[in-house]
Amino acid sequence: MKSKKYIPIAKLLSISLSLTLLLSSCTFGDNFDVDFSSLPTDSTWFKVTSQRTSTLDELPADCYIEGVPAAEYGQKIEQSPMWRTSSTSAASVMQEILDFSNRRTVIELSGTYWSVDEEWNDVQLSGKVVLPADGKAERIILVSHYTIGSNAEAPSRCFPIEAMLAKMGYVMIFPDYLGYGVTADRVHPYLVMDLTAINVLDMYLAVRPFLEAAGVEVAHDEILLMGYSQGGANTMAVQHLIEAAYYDEIKIRRVFAGGGPYDVLATYDHFVTRDTADYPIAVPLVMQGMIIGNNLDLNMEQLMQPYVYENIDYWVNSKQFTTAQVNKAIGTKITHNILSEKGMDRTSEEVSELYKAMTTNSILSYSWEPQAPVYLFHSMDDEVVTFANASRARVKWTNANIQYNFGHYGGHIQGYLRFVSSVKTLLEQDREIK
């Protein structure tokens, strides 16, 4: 992948200082009367397209888990056998999320920013910023979201559960990723780590000067990174990008990564060798992502069962359906019923090319070890992202400053709720230390 010529942060900040003079009459106070969409901005900054204020007395109706309103999801997963392996209940976790949300009013800003696509062409992407309505924050948290199916679940279109942390005094930044939000008509390059890491970091680079010019006060420059599932792996890729290319400009306070496919090849090969995919949509998602994101000259029609290949545009690329709905449409967890005979043949030339791309896009294949402190969470009961990812990370990153939290926390989504709850606790402890 070619090297991108970024505008230095120092230049962005000098632009922001000049525009701050124009914005000096805009104050937050107690009235929360700043219209962010009307503020003058630089073309390289985040551009607000919609704004709303939320009191968060309860989980918003557009706060989803697998396409189901989060407020209802606790009741749904209480019935799951996988949940009963957890040491806590769905109801208690959901209530805890509600409890720590009842602190401040927040402002949600959906908007666009510039980044690059898999061909290295400029592309306008979208995302959401959630901040305390008084305009005062402790730090910025850059969040990489988990795997979604429908565009309604893209952060710019909904209220991510992690956004509740804004009420603790954090600015939350949520990129949609290429293929969602304003680019929903494009194929998402699933698990193409270097590209998605750039897309995520570009939003931070666009939001930071915008917030400064708007008068948002962030007490500390060091940022936090956070993500679960696909977002967990991508969060580690963002950490790598910052520590490799932005170490003088961006300082990381801490990284929170949970349930991530840090070894994409091992995750996918797990489906093939066991001939079981508990999360069926992952099979076509990974294959399509590797082909599109790495410009591989491979024909998916030869590698998938006809009924999957013929429906992938409708089921997946239309962005109309949640992952749960697509899993139901696929109708099987048997991998050889999803992949063709050639697709199941790990010795074939085509699968070999796929596996090379998966290795390239596995964060554990990088010649790198995290420098900033990391909190790495994984449920040992995870049926979607095999626990082998976390155990391999522990073996690989032996000298890194990592706090591991491995336990029987239920399935993948149950682990997600536990992860968010544990991050909230760690953030509270961090504030007490200061």
Functional labels for PLM-detected ranges:
Residues 190-213:
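Alpha/beta-hydrolase active-site loop
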Residues 30-125, 131-134:
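Catalytic-loop region of hydrolases
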Residues 49-52, 258-367:
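Accessory cap/linker subdomain of secreted extracellular hydrolases
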Residues 205-215, 219-278:
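Primarily recognizes the serine-hydrolase "nucleophile elbow" in alpha/beta-hydrolase
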Residues 119-126, 130-165:
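Short, surface-exposed "cap/lid" segments of acyl-processing enzymes
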Residues 350, 355-361, 381-434:
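C-terminal catalytic histidine-bearing segment of alpha/beta-hydrolase fold enzymes
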Residues 370, 375-382:
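Short beta-strand/loop motif that positions the catalytic acidic residue
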Residues 23-25:
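C-terminal motif of bacterial Sec signal peptides marking the signal peptidase cleavage site
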